[in-house]
């Protein structure tokens, strides 16, 4: 869209060169979020009105995937319970139910999952050991081989420099090779907490946090509850 292209031009691309037009970038992102919210609301209304249509099942599946960590468990259940009994037995409903179950694991308002990861010293440690009680925490999932992930790191460095004392950042890599992960951390100058799930797409990050692609992040409130996901 034109708005997304404007964001790339005004904020994302300049940030790669160390130029952070933060105020302008945030203004565009807020507008992008408003557009997305209106689209999601319209999709939800369509599903309610056409709750006996297979098309609504397809839309519901897309909505669940695109709003993970934005919907609460109650909202997910409300969406799923809104279909007619006849549609509950449709073959496509099985796929939608599986998606809904995955999204419940990372629903907004749910508590974060404490998983065991590896730190830079090679120690197996619980994620909770790196959480900062009483503060907002951000889990940033990435990998050294992921070009979009590497492209996001300048933004993360800037965020750490500006908000590092009050906002706890934890990057969690899904690199399977220890050397690749550590080399990337050093190359990118990532000074905040660094952990790794070397089981990759089959490890606890993929299972407990439903991370099927990177980069992806989840923000937790001071009580360890999920506030939102996919924040950029």
Regions found by a protein language model. Name each.
Residues 165-180, 190-202:
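Thiol-based oxidoreductase modules, predominantly thioredoxin-like and allied folds used
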Residues 135-137, 141-161:
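Conserved redox-active cysteine motifs that mediate thiol-disulfide chemistry
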Residues 138-139, 169, 217:
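Hydrophobic beta-strand anchors of alpha/beta hydrolase catalytic cores
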Residues 151, 158, 180-187:
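Short alpha-helix adjacent to the SAM-binding motif of class I
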Residues 190, 197-232:
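Thiol/disulfide oxidoreductase modules built on the thioredoxin-like
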Residues 1-130, 134-135:
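Oxidative protein folding and maturation machinery
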Residues 113-116, 142, 170, 195:
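Conserved Rossmann-like nucleotide-binding pocket used by diverse enzymes
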Residues 115, 176, 216-218:
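Generic short beta-strand
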């Amino acid at each position: 869209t034109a708005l997304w292209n404007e964001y790339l031009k005004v904020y994302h691309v300049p940030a790669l060169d160390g130029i952070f037009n933060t105020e302008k970038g945030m203004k565009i992102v807020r507008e992008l979020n408003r557009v997305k919210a209106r689209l999601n609301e319209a999709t939800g209304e369509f599903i309610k009105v056409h709750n006996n249509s297979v098309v609504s099942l397809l839309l519901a599946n897309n909505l669940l995937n695109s709003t993970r960590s934005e919907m609460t468990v109650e909202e997910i259940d409300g969406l799923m319970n809104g279909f007619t009994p006849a549609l509950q037995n449709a073959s496509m409903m099985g796929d939608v139910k599986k998606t809904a179950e995955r999204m419940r694991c990372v629903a907004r308002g749910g508590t974060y999952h404490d998983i065991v990861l590896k730190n830079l010293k090679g120690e197996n440690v619980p994620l909770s050991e790196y959480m900062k009680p009483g503060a907002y925490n951000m889990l940033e999932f990435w990998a050294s081989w992921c070009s979009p992930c590497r492209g996001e790191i300048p933004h993360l460095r800037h965020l750490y420099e500006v908000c590092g004392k009050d906002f706890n950042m934890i990057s969690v890599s899904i690199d399977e090779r220890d050397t690749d992960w550590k080399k990337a951390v050093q190359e990118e100058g990532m000074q905040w907490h660094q952990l790794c799930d070397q089981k990759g797409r089959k490890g606890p990050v993929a299972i407990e946090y439903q991370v099927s692609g990177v980069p992806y992040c989840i923000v937790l409130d001071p009580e360890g509850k999920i506030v939102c996901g996919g924040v950029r």
